[in-house]
């Protein structure tokens, strides 16, 4: 005798096919989500590294600018008060001089002032330099352009000093 088992072939096979397709779709969907998350994580990582490098570069730039600004606004200089006063500036930007005085015999008056390692100077052969020209060390706050060439003939001065007020460079004797 033969016996047959009714497996509900139509209904059961349709259910198996649908279940198989759903599982396949779910696996594909999970794989796609994993790939998309990995790509987003990679983009975020690259962006973070790029911003870190840019920030480090900007911080270095700000540091360099601060160094340049501090160098431009304050210049350390050695000032010697002797029969003639010599001021040797380390930079030729805007000079704000700090005093470091060594006194020997105090002079009656200042007759010479040098800036920028002697390239630009006044030299008055008759009389004294006025306060604006260097007799008073508090008055020395000049924007100096070191030119090292005479500005012209004047019997009281061999050379003059040049100042820059931001718009023009002016050489003056008095």
UniProtKB/Swiss-Prot annotation:
One Pfam assignment: Sh_2
Disulfide bonds: none
Domain of life: Viruses
Keywords of this entry: Glycoprotein, Membrane, Transmembrane, Transmembrane helix
Residues with attached carbohydrate: 165
InterPro entries per UniProt: Metap_SH
Subcellular location: Membrane
GO CC terms in record: membrane
Topology versus the membrane: Single-pass membrane protein
Main subcellular location: membrane
Keyword Transmembrane: yes
Keyword presence, Disulfide bond: no
Bilayer-crossing regions: 33-53
Record's protein name: Small hydrophobic protein
Source organism: Turkey rhinotracheitis virus (TRTV)
């Amino acid at each position: 005798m033969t016996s047959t088992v009714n497996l509900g072939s139509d209904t059961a096979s349709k259910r198996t096919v649908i279940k198989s397709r759903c599982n396949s779709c779910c696996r594909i969907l999970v794989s796609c989500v994993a790939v998309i998350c990995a790509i987003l994580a990679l983009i975020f990582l690259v962006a973070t590294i790029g911003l870190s490098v840019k920030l480090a570069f900007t911080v270095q730039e700000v540091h360099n600018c601060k160094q340049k600004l501090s160098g431009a606004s304050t210049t350390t200089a050695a000032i010697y008060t002797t029969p003639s006063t010599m001021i040797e500036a380390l930079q030729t930007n805007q000079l704000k001089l700090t005093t470091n005085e060594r006194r020997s015999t105090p002079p009656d008056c200042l007759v010479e002032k040098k800036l920028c390692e002697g390239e630009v100077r006044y030299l008055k052969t008759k009389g004294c330099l006025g306060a604006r020209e260097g007799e008073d060390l508090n008055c020395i706050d000049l924007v100096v352009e070191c030119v090292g060439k005479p500005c012209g003939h004047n019997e009281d001065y061999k050379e003059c000093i040049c100042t820059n007020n931001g718009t023009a460079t002016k050489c003056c004797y008095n």
